[in-house]
Amino acid sequence: MRLKAEIPCPSFTLQYELSFTNMLNMLRLSGVPIKSCDRKELKNIVVAGGPCACNPEPIADFVDIFFIGEGEEVDLEVIELFRKCRAEGKSKQEFLELSSKIEGVYVPALYDVTYNEDGTIKSFTPKGDAPAKIHKRIMLDMDKSFYPDNFVVPLVEIVHDRAVQEIFRGCIRGCRFCQAGIIYRPVREKSPETINKQCRALCDNTGYDEVSLSSLSSSDYSQIVPLLDKLNEWSKDEKVSISLPSLRVDGFTDDIMNKIKTVRKSGLTFAPEAGSQRMRDVINKNVREDELLQTCTTAFAGGWTTVKLYFMIGLPTETMDDVAAIAGLGQSVVDAYYKCPEKPKGKSVRVTVSASSFVPKPFTPFQWEPQDTIPVLHEKQQHIKDSITTRKIQFNYHDADTSYLEAVFARGDRKLCKVMELACERGFHFDGWNDCFSLEKWLELFDECGVDPSFYANRHRSFDEILPWDHIDYGVTKDFLIRECKKAYADTTTPHCRLKCNNCGAAKYGKGVCFEKRKNMV
């Protein structure tokens, strides 16, 4: 199947750095020149957005327009401008210059980048009237956010084969490795009435019998219990199950448990992220081991026999003792099952321990930190394996090679564009799939282009270094990120936004939990 080359604005959502080659491959297959400078006319304007637009520089040569932030409104404004410019016979350059004046629009071609002798960025200079700082767009009233409730349901089975309903955007917690928890600040909730109406429409129009209430931390929705009550008024009779895929360890209560198992028990997944309390303090997870064990005991008493635990290895200051503690925490959950008098009779427990590799991301307190080398990550993965002593625990881990390439592109600059161009010419695609990925071939590309990938993945940055994304504003100040990074090295936690305003900068938007908390403190 080929794209049609006459599509006016081919647009891409970039959720994952290893999907960059897929975007270029789609353009190539459509007959559209992959480089922006080779597309001269006002057609085939390539647009991209999503989380990876936080650092657009590694693909700046290929994309005409990036949407910075949330796209529900800015996309309509750019489309309307595009129609107007075409009707008036304006050039592509004129359209791009006008687009750059829309808040949330970044046009890479309107900026020049210079570099120091050591390869770091020396300056980032806008051309003409292009803004020096690109500010993100934000949807302040989530009840007015467009949400599709009638769409084509795939004929084949897909990974997330269920209806998905966003209940709020942002996160109050502030985990120091988490990019989404920063770039989607402040927290903004949909009303229970809007959520209920949209969930009902989703099920009526698609035939799905499961609704997943989606957010970064669903149990942090301020009206979660009234919402579940409202949903259960119709979902129970219609045999529609409600799942909360993103649960805090300290947010899973008896009340919530009983409300989400009325039709069928969905899987339970918790993310302690680190095995030791010291490491959980470093990353500001603010979860204690006794809270996790109590939560799991509650689930076991409610009939659950399987639990998934998500962890991360390679975090700043991590030691091998911290790594071994991951296996130890998994064992403690197994022990909690057999100590629970109300556990299901005659059934065994299954605990899945999954460990991803830390990838430093832009706009996080750890954006200056190096990633562990691949051999060190392999050593830590093996250490967890060796520390597990029971068959009740299944251990899964992410491929360290793909995590390395992810780290390269997550914090890369425009010098990586020539690598991406060559990768497209050589047919690289589906790099997020192990059967299509070869780190050896990627390393050959880097070497051929004279680019050192470890410069991006394994190098510690100083706080005063100009970063490739410093010209972009996601609402949270660099001073706040620096403070949080320093607190991590002091093993010091920060309270969440509903307890205390930590002056991250997001209150400037004038809405959301951050603003309300700050207003009440003044």
Task: Please provide the spans of the model-predicted regions.
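Glycine-rich beta-alpha loop elements in corrinoid/cobalamin-binding modules
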Residues: 2-125, 365-413, 421-435
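Conserved SAM/AdoMet-binding glycine-rich loop
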Residues: 9, 18, 201-352, 356, ...
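Short secondary-structure boundary/capping segments
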Residues: 27, 61-66, 82-84, 182, ...
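Flexible glycine/acidic-rich beta-alpha junction loops that bind and position SAM and/or redox cofactors
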Residues: 58, 112-116, 222, 252-256, ...
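N-terminal [4Fe-4S]-dependent radical SAM core
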Residues: 108, 114, 118-164, 475-487, ...
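N-terminal pre-triad scaffold of radical SAM enzymes
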Residues: 153-177, 203, 244, 357-359
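Local cysteine-cluster metal-coordination motifs and their immediate loop/turn environment
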Residues: 166-182, 495-510
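Radical SAM enzyme core and accessory elements
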Residues: 389-522
